Amino acid sequence: MSKKKATSSDVAKRAGVSQATVSMVLNKKYNVSFSRETVEKVEQAARELGYHLPGRKNRKESRKEKLIVVFCPTLTSPYYVLLLQGIEAVANKQGYGVFICNTQRDPRLEEKYLRMMGTIEPLGIIYCCNPNPDFQQQVEELAQTIPLVIISNKEKTTTIDAINQDNTVVGRMMARHLLDLGHRDVAFITPPLTRRQWQRTKRVNGFVKEFEKEGLKDHVIIKAADEAIDMQIPRMDSEYSMGYELTMELLDEGREFTAIAGQNDMMAIGALDALHEARIHVPKDVSVIGCDNIFYSGIRKISLTTIDHFVALKGRDACDIILHKIDEQDRFLTDSAPVSLYNIEYTPKLIARRTTGSVSYTHLRAHETSAHLV
């Protein structure tokens, strides 16, 4: 004999409340005030009895589309393409669509997309980088009502789920590799070091601190692109061009260095081409290191030394967190789901290839001679 299907009357008896209260609580009619104790009793009774409102579907089923929104600052960077591939791989496997909001690092666009969230009603939101500081509070409030993950730098404290990266550690790793190879005069090329892009500054600071530890702080040249660049719509070759042009500027200025560190791999590849054009041999004359370990870096003719911080896996993890939070919400009929905060971080790894090497004897002799003359 089949088990009798539970009714709202059964739930009311189990919870010790009226049927009307059961109906209003499970329908989330919170214009009527109920104590947290009453809400939890009704919810627990409904779960124990396996009761569902007639025709009720969970949030995922009640939507025509299962949608996750991704805020991305640019679609021209291989780094962000890797992140998106990781996100979409997980989302598509679970039947979710991904809607990308390309903010182009423009606060006006970011604000516009944030306003649209109430209309779009996605099931989850992923920020591929830190929100603009002007919208941080708004994003934190949004995270109270919808699963939201930020792929960010660890040194900003937040109450939002995050896939973190300590860029200070990454910068230190880049510097330590060059120091261990004997490099003492180096240059760090980077996109604009703006208030919004403070994670870039963290990487630079980590790099400088490692040299400072060896008493070589003044031996690091920081070459940053003009802030106006971040206000332009990025081209496909924006980061490559920045790396090329900043390296050419260093050469034109006659600056002394035996190694160049690029904020990312595309900038480092731009530096490689500039050095090649100037007939400077890599790594015999100048070593080059990047960061991100994108596909191009492993191509045999490039073979760029870089730092791998597992970009695609970060995208996968961010989407996994979103899906877990959605499922967690759907197991509860009210807002009394347990509160959990996810914080995932990978340990970065040095990938030593052919663009870095020990300082040549000629460079060491020149350095010693100049130091003696001083």
Features from the language model and the residues they span:
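Short beta-strand elements in bilobed, periplasmic/extracellular small-molecule ligand-binding domains
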Residues: 92-101, 211-234
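Flexible loop/hinge segments that line or gate small-molecule binding clefts
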Residues: 128-173, 189-194, 266, 292-304
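Conserved small/polar residues in nucleotide/adenosyl-binding loops
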Residues: 11, 22, 362-369
